[in-house]
Design a protein with these regions (language model features):
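Glycine-rich phosphate/diphosphate-binding loop of Rossmann-like nucleotide-binding domains
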Residues: 5-35, 41-42
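Single conserved hydrophobic/aromatic residue that forms the stacking wall/gate
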Residues: 160-167
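N-terminal small/polar loop signature for handling phosphorylated ligands or for N-terminal nucleophile
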Residues: 26-78, 86, 107
Length: 167
């Protein structure tokens, strides 16, 4: 039996401009390889809807597993969720469990659970949530695509929760 293959898609204009340094590709590559998952490709792409959709389609067809990093936060340029949904022909829904986790988190921190933060509870239909013990904003898995936040500490958390299920 051959080892599964994987690809990483890092999404964000801030990475391409050099304003933010990517720390997720190298770390995730080490984790995947330690599990016998062969990382075959990594791409850094801009926050452009068509580019995200086409890259996800191409890479999910070519590899057993795809991991995305970035674009699922509360800001206007965080469009990864809607693009992943579009790539698989799914609708984006307000996920009740994700919303409850986020509401509880923001109530406990005393911060307002405003519309921008509520956006982080929007998940493609049929996606499975990935828990986030750091900030409560979940990642998700749709088909063979694992969608992670770009914040390195959250990526580490998501990875520790998802890699054991791939053995």
């Amino acid at each position: 039996m051959t080892n599964p293959t994987a690809a990483i898609i890092v999404i964000g204009d801030e990475i391409l401009s050099g304003r933010t340094k990517d720390k997720n590709i190298g770390w995730l590559a080490e984790q995947l390889n330690s599990q016998g998952i062969q990382l075959r490709e990594a791409r850094v792409i801009p926050d452009i809807r068509e580019t995200i959709i086409e890259t996800v389609k191409t890479m999910s067809a070519a590899h057993d597993l795809v991991f995305t990093s970035g674009g699922i936060g509360p800001t206007h340029d965080d469009i990864t969720t809607e693009c992943i949904a579009a790539a698989f022909g799914k609708k984006v829904i307000r996920h009740p469990e994700a919303e409850a986790r986020l509401l509880s988190h923001y109530e406990n921190t005393g911060l307002e659970f405003n519309a921008a933060r509520q956006k982080m509870a929007d998940i493609p239909e049929d996606a499975a949530l990935i828990d986030n013990p750091l900030s409560a904003a979940p990642g998700f898995i749709l088909e063979n695509v694992h969608v992670f936040a770009g914040v390195p500490s959250i990526t580490v958390s998501y990875t520790h929760l998802t890699l054991p299920t791939m053995e």
